[in-house]
Amino acid sequence: MPPPASSMGFSDLLNPQNPESTPSTPASKSSAPSTPSTEQSNSNMASSVSLLPPLMKGARPANEEPRQDLPRPYKCPLCDRAFHRLEHQTRHIRTHTGEKPHACQFPGCTKRFSRSDELTRHSRIHNNPNSRRNNKAQHLAAAAAAAAANQDNALASNAASMMPPPSKPITRSAPVSQVGSPDISPPHSFSNYAGHMRSNLGSYARNSDRASSGMDINLLATAASQVERDEHYGFHNGPRGHHIFGSRHHNNNRLPSLSAYAISQNMSRSYSHDEDDMYSHRVKRSRPNSPNSTAPSSPTFSHDSLSPTPDHTPLATPAHSPRLRPLGTSELQLPSIRHLSLHHTPALAPMEPQPEGPNYYSPTQPHVGPSISDIMSKPDGTQRKLPVPQVPKVAVQDLLSPGFTSVSSSASNSVAGGDLADRF
């Protein structure tokens, strides 16, 4: 019974479209009671014809009703559509997000697709040898590969050509970098540059003028601190007849804030050599006659923070260098701070010695500071009671000196060394 119903429904649909079939319909009806076999053949033909249009159109009306009843658990979170399968939902979501995970694997092709069937259809373009697009794509891919290879070669050649030049300025421009960044320069850079500086002071002065404006504070601070250190040397060596250094001792408290800043910036300097001390005095002798006297003095100050015998005195904590810390406190005349600093670690030992005469320092004595036996051998009882290096700053000799503190002279003596005083 269902086939006749479907055939009748199909005939009803065809009646308005085909008016010529109207006379044939009654003829078939009139012949139906006479020939039952004809009715069966007509019904079979009608059922077969009814299936042709859906198959040709790609639709399935017979299976569409049960398909609508199937559950659609996979719903799109961005719209109201739902899907029977997860891969269908994933493919649909890519239409919202624009994601294209399927990339063409052909060399030189950068196209991507959101569906795998689109990628398959696109890959046929590359696989077809007779396609014009394939030939064009191959040419473009070859050109892109050649350009990339040329670019890589150019970068490699540029890198190879740029490598040798930095090796030379590293050692020659080290003192300029030490002024701006005191913690970066290697320890051997200044020793290589010191011999070159002796004959090229003018060139260094010109190079220092090219420094960036960010180093102005460091230059001022190092210059002020170097002037103060020269004053200490001049006062200590003044009785020996050197008026060049003794003439500056009246500027004792000049720029204390800059000196404190320079001390904080250069606390981590822990490299020094014997030739550094010799060169520092040459610079100091030429300071009154040099118009750019502050430029050559900056590298010497950055390396005078240790004794001239680095093989015997490697400080474990160069950031807490004792020679630089009490220098600013003694100039600011803060006895309370000096009393508080009596309990520093033994790394502060080099600040303790106080010059009592020309026989205080011997070249063979290690520059670590006086031992306990040296402290106990002091004639003054107050000095024996205070084992910390900064004790001599509040000693009687320090209080008796009106215009200069013994701590500064002791600090300068510990930095320069007794053998340096004997040279004068």
Curated annotation (Swiss-Prot):
Subcellular location field: Nucleus
Gene Ontology CC terms: cytoplasm; nucleus
GO biological process per UniProt: carbon catabolite repression of transcription from RNA polymerase II promoter by glucose
UniProt protein name: Probable DNA-binding protein creA
Underlying gene: creA
Zinc finger residue extent: C2H2-type: 74-96, 102-126
Compositionally biased intervals (Low complexity): 21-38, 288-302, 406-416
SUBUNIT field: Interacts with creB.
Protein's job: Transcription regulator component of the regulatory network controlling carbon source utilization through ubiquitination and deubiquitination involving creA, creB, creC, creD and acrB. Represses the transcription of the alcR, alcA and aldA genes by binding to a GC-rich region in their promoter. Also plays a role in response to carbon starvation and the control of extracellular proteases activity.
Disordered, as annotated region: 1-74, 115-134, 161-184, 269-327, 347-386, 403-424
GO molecular function: RNA polymerase II cis-regulatory region sequence-specific DNA binding; zinc ion binding
PTM summary: Ubiquitinated. Deubiquitinated by creB, probably to control its activity or amount.
Family (UniProt): Belongs to the creA/MIG C2H2-type zinc-finger protein family.
Biased composition (Polar residues): 39-50
Organism: Aspergillus fumigatus (strain CBS 144.89 / FGSC A1163 / CEA10)
UniProt xrefs under SMART domains: ZnF_C2H2 (SM00355)
Chief place of localization: nucleus
Basic and acidic residues: bias regions: 62-72
Keywords carried by this UniProt record: DNA-binding, Metal-binding, Nucleus, Repeat, Repressor, Transcription, Transcription regulation, Ubl conjugation, Zinc, Zinc-finger
Source species, domain of life: Eukaryota
